[in-house]
Amino acid sequence: MRLSRFFMPILKENPKEAEIVSHRLMLRTGMIRQQSAGIYTWLPLGKRVLDKVNAVIREEQNRSGAIELLMPTLQSAELWQESGRYDAYGKEMLRIKDRQDRPMLYGPTNEEMITDIFRSYVKSYRNLPLNLYHIQLKFRDEIRPRFGTMRSREFLMKDAYSFDLDRAGAEHAYKRMFAAYLRTFDRLGLRAIPMRADTGPIGGNLSHEFIILADTGESEVFCHKDFLGFDIPGEDTNFDDVASMNAIFEKWTSRYAATSEMHEEAAFDAIPEGERLSARGIEVGHIFYFGTKYSEAMGAKVLGPDGKEHTVHMGSYGIGPTRLVPAIIEASHDDNGIIWPKGIAPFDIVVINMKTGDDACDTACGRLYSDLGKAGFDVLLDDTDERAGGKFATADIIGVPVQVIVGPRSIANGEVEVKDRKTGARETMTVEAAINKLVAAR
């Protein structure tokens, strides 16, 4: 992508409405634009990041055995009345009526709809276990939306729902998602700590929040420092193996970890003082096992191997991509801007033409842009007439991991400068060497 043809409205000043770093940087870099309270447009730069975050989530959901579908944002009130949650959910749920005066709602969650889909098609235990997920917009009418897309009213969610014959199967499904979430957050450059959580309006008796540590987090968290060094499940993880899933779950729940809502001071004090960690954190994922809460109310049953009807056991598993993006920024930035982890940056490499219109610079930049693009990189070419300082500031604030700087003096010697955005390390080399080095490190 040539920057001269890309829509990226950079703001020179810090927006007054932004209270935290991620909100400020997302507005300044032109990633998002507020349309009304808690509702945002994702502009091209932000959409590129969001798409890459979603791609990682999809890969790990698919790896764990979940199957993608897509449910609508608008739901019939009848399903919620059937489950008993229509009146209980409260004012966060946006209720509307269609032209036939039928009550509808803008879905804040999808337990009722997915249960209705399941009961319509699945009749036998032979079709279990089953885990279905989608990535879709939701709406919750927050009293006080704040912090940009960190706590907005309309937001994107990945929701997965598992269906099993009995509790043992459901707990295995829960542990599969537990391991999948650890892998997902690690690939997004985050160390997420699973903490026992309240089930809230979704219900159930087993739940974990996945929390990343950040000074701007809304939650106060208490945990053992060992979590910072635990190994993440590898690519070869066998999600079907019960023993493997049990081992991962037991390891990651063997140490104390709790948010302030679930905190037990005596248990935390029992940890040796040097191994305690108290900090603030951001919730980036939440998983629930809620047994037969919805399946019982809505008649989701299958014939078991004994020939009798069994009410299925369910779980739900949520990750908010539009919340994850600012969470990643909160965990990875400096005074100059965002530092994106590789793989989710809007671009992999930015080629900075220090003197657009200079034949030697234009030729070298053209080659870098072409060859690196053919090698599979997402490349941004800054071919604008902006002054050098402005180009460097733009490259830094949008957080592209690698900068290749092409100036008339260096290119006269056949050389360019390669800068690592995270470390600030710089290295001068030939154009050929720069291409080879970047391709080899891919």
From Swiss-Prot:
Signal peptide: none annotated. One of its GO terms (biological process) is prolyl-tRNA aminoacylation. Keywords: Aminoacyl-tRNA synthetase, ATP-binding, Cytoplasm, Ligase, Nucleotide-binding, Protein biosynthesis. PROSITE patterns: AA_TRNA_LIGASE_II. It comes from the Bacteria. InterPro entries: aa-tRNA-synt_IIb, aa-tRNA-synth_II, aa-tRNA-synth_II/BPL/LPL, Anticodon-bd, Anticodon-bd_dom_sf, Pro-tRNA-ligase_IIa, Pro-tRNA-synth_IIa_bac-type, Pro-tRNA_synthetase. It is found in: Cytoplasm. It catalyses: tRNA(Pro) + L-proline + ATP = L-prolyl-tRNA(Pro) + AMP + diphosphate. It is an enzyme of class 6 (ligase). Its EC number is 6.1.1.15. GO terms for molecular function: ATP binding; proline-tRNA ligase activity. GO terms for cellular component: cytosol. NCBIfam families: PRK12325.1, proS_fam_II. Homodimer. HAMAP family: Pro_tRNA_synth_type2 (MF_01570). This is Proline--tRNA ligase. It comes from Sinorhizobium medicae (strain WSM419).
